[in-house]
Design a protein with these regions (language model features):
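Juxtamembrane/interfacial segments flanking transmembrane helices
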Residues: 80-87, 170, 233-238
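Alpha-helical transmembrane spans
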Residues: 14-80, 197-230, 256-309
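Conserved beta-hairpin
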Residues: 68-115, 242, 247
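Non-transmembrane, membrane-adjacent beta-strand/coil modules in membrane-associated proteins
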Residues: 2-16, 93-162
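Alpha-helical membrane-embedding segments
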Residues: 87-96, 117-128, 265-279
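N-terminal membrane-targeting/pre-transmembrane regions
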Residues: 1-56, 144-147, 151-180, 184-206
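Short capping micro-motif at the N-terminus of alpha-helices
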Residues: 101, 165-166, 250-252
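Active-site and channel-lining beta-strand-loop segments
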Residues: 230-257
Length: 311
């Protein structure tokens, strides 16, 4: 009875996780740094009068917030890094990405201590080495590693790609792979790398869509910069030509003109979010929403120039 249950247990799905604490701490440190300075810049921008320096403070706050989000994603990816061995595949889990390696495509496993140290191009900080390198005797290799020294690396060479993993118990890891390889695969699998969750949106792989969203954001920044730079020179009470009211002349507080910039920001946010969602179902419609957002920014820039010149 015992001899019959041992093979079954040995072929259960096994998740091997490398040491991740250092990588998460370093990545989290960048998140905290960017978030703190973003909050400080936002506080300056929110409490200051409308002028170009206020625009710069707001821009810095937004950029630092984006940096914090990016590093938070990378820190989460380090925390979630795992090598999952099931019946037919070895799956590398890295954040919102999974790399599936059929076990029957694995040709050999090479301990890192037997090879020269590689210089990884990609994400590189203490406890995080994710990217690619040309490794002597192995070739082009994808790294999903948190290693502190080459001794912690295990190179998995397949018929298509080579991978560098951080495995402390390399003998045990190799035994698990070899046990499954000896039995042969039950179901056919294709070696692939796939995004999951929010990273699976087609938007992230569409350079045209990313470019359209980026240009819209840049035009929105130009709109804010012009409005905030021109605002201090206006008198407190001005003639308002925006919005147009069929030739009716209005007078009011100059703060009314700030609504042009706020409208541009709202249009950018709405069109970008809806564009990304729609793009997942219909690429052309999603692209049109992002492009139209940029066109509306141009219309608002022209409206702002005319409104300020007439005020």
């Amino acid at each position: 009875m015992h001899s019959g249950t041992r093979p079954r247990r040995s072929l259960e799905t096994v998740a091997v996780q490398p040491p991740r604490a250092l990588g998460v701490i370093v990545g989290g440190g960048f998140v905290v740094w960017a978030a703190v300075f973003s909050a400080l810049s936002a506080r300056v921008a929110i409490g200051a009068p409308a002028e170009f320096k206020t625009f710069l403070a707001g821009l810095v706050a937004v950029l630092l917030a984006l940096i914090a989000v990016v590093f938070a994603n990378w820190a989460y990816s380090v925390w979630s890094l795992a090598y999952v061995i099931d019946r037919d595949t070895l799956t590398i889990r890295w954040g919102f990405r999974e790399v599936v390696i059929p076990i029957d495509t694995i040709q050999r496993m090479v301990p890192g201590r037997t090879l020269d140290e590689a210089h990884v191009q990609g994400l590189n900080w203490w406890g995080c080495h994710v990217g690619a390198a040309d490794v002597k005797r192995v070739g082009y290799t994808l790294f999903y590693s948190t290693h502190g020294s080459p001794d912690e690396l295990l190179y998995v060479v397949t018929t298509e790609e080579s991978y560098a993993l951080t495995v402390l118990d390399q003998a045990g890891f190799a035994e698990k792979i070899q046990a499954r390889a000896a039995l042969g695969s039950v179901d056919p699998h294709v070696q692939r790398s796939a995004a999951t969750g929010v990273a699976a949106f087609p938007f992230w792989r569409d350079r045209v869509a990313i470019g359209a969203a980026g240009i819209s954001a840049l035009l929105c920044a130009v709109l804010f910069a012009y409005v905030y730079a021109s605002y201090p020179a206006l008198p407190n009470v001005i003639e308002l030509s925006f919005p147009a009211l069929g030739g009716v002349i209005r007078v009011g507080d100059k703060s009314e003109l700030l609504k042009i910039a706020y409208l541009g920001g709202g249009v950018l946010a709405l069109n970008t979010v809806l564009g990304v969602v729609v793009h997942a179902r219909e690429r052309a419609a999603g692209l049109w929403m992002m492009v139209s957002g940029g066109m509306l920014q141009i219309v608002l820039i022209v409206a702002a120039v005319l409104a300020f010149q007439r005020s």
